[in-house]
């Protein structure tokens, strides 16, 4: 644990130095290929940073923050595109917007006082559910639950933990920068289509960077060859494939074994089905299913395909057990410190 914390400090210092180089040197180079070439060493550094960790949580978080989001944001920065262009007013803001999954809310709620209490109640309820899951884990979950029941609970765990971590990061950045941030999740369990789930409800920072970095360029490139209609689907498929490859890379950071490409196939499948779904929506003569029916269908599809392609590599390498043990370890450490303070 102490070694991991030392590595954590080293990684964040390395990230700060790297981003300082981008802010003070790369930003002075004219946009385009030359600035992109100046950023190549940073891309490589951010690609290697997660390898300093052995903890699943640190590997995943550093892989998501640096290797995925920061590298894609810097790629866009090379061509003077948002979110790092126009250049923020100081290094602190540039560092935060580059390395954290945050985006300024340009249309803040007109009635924040009314909405805030409800959000706190929802957050408290989610914390309660997450605590219940940890209690289930502590009481020999693996001996009393079927595989399907465990995967369903673990899916809820993944969602809740991801949202709670990113909400905490967003709140911290909001206080530091003095501006309201857009929510990272938008009640994904209410999605009634795959398109809605992936683009408007689940981890919204990912489509925020993949759309300008992958979807739009591929669509523009393919438009003269395929036409605008088909180019849109090509851009969408490319986006899902890139997302799958990035997930595959994060799996490698955690497992340190050659990829099996199951996770990439998961996202490729979802990309194909999402394209079919959009094509069917454009056929006006097809009946629109009820929200309850389509919502249930999407939930079942997500669980079945996740159990088939997303989780097997994780389960074979006992990643789920490492995740659970790390969560329980953190809870025990917090309890000990609270007891020491009270005594």
UniProtKB/Swiss-Prot annotation:
It catalyses: a long chain fatty alcohol + a fatty acyl-CoA = a wax ester + CoA. Signal peptide: none annotated. InterPro entries: Wax_synthase (IPR044851), Wax_synthase_dom (IPR032805), Wax_synthase_Magnoliopsida (IPR017088). Keywords: Acyltransferase, Lipid biosynthesis, Lipid metabolism, Membrane, Transferase, Transmembrane, Transmembrane helix. One of its GO terms (cellular component) is membrane. GO terms for molecular function: long-chain-alcohol O-fatty-acyltransferase activity. This is Probable long-chain-alcohol O-fatty-acyltransferase 2.
């Amino acid at each position: 644990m102490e070694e991991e914390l030392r590595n954590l400090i080293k990684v964040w210092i390395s990230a700060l130095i790297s981003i300082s180089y981008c802010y003070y040197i790369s930003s002075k180079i004219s946009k385009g290929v030359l600035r992109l070439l100046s950023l190549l060493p940073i891309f490589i550094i951010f690609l290697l940073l997660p390898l300093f960790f052995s903890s699943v949580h640190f590997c995943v978080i550093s892989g998501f923050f640096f290797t995925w989001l920061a590298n894609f944001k810097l790629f866009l920065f090379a061509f003077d595109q948002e979110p790092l262009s126009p250049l923020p007013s100081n290094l602190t803001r540039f560092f935060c917007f580059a390395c954290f999954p945050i985006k300024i809310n340009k249309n803040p709620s007109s009635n924040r006082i009314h909405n805030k209490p409800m959000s706190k109640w929802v957050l408290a309820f989610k914390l309660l559910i997450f605590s219940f899951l940890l209690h289930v884990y502590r009481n020999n979950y693996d001996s009393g639950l079927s595989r399907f029941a465990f995967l369903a609970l673990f899916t809820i765990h993944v969602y809740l933990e991801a949202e709670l971590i990113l909400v905490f990061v967003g709140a911290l950045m909001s206080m530091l920068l003095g501006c309201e941030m857009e929510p990272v999740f938008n009640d994904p369990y209410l999605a009634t289509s795959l398109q809605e789930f992936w683009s408007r409800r689940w981890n919204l920072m990912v489509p925020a960077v993949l759309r300008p970095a992958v979807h739009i360029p591929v669509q523009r490139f393919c438009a003269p060859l395929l036409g605008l209609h088909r180019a849109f689907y090509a851009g969408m498929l490319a986006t899902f494939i890139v997302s799958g490859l990035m997930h595959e890379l994060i799996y490698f950071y955690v497992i340190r074994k050659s990829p099996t490409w199951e996770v990439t196939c998961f996202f490729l499948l979802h990309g194909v089905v999402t394209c079919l779904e959009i094509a069917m929506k454009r056929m006006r003569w097809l009946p629109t299913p009820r929200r309850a029916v389509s919502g249930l269908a999407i939930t079942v599809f997500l669980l079945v395909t996740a159990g088939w392609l997303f989780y097997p590599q994780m389960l074979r390498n006992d990643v789920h057990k490492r995740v659970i043990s790390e969560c329980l370890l953190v809870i025990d450490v917090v309890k000990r410190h609270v007891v020491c303070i009270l005594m």
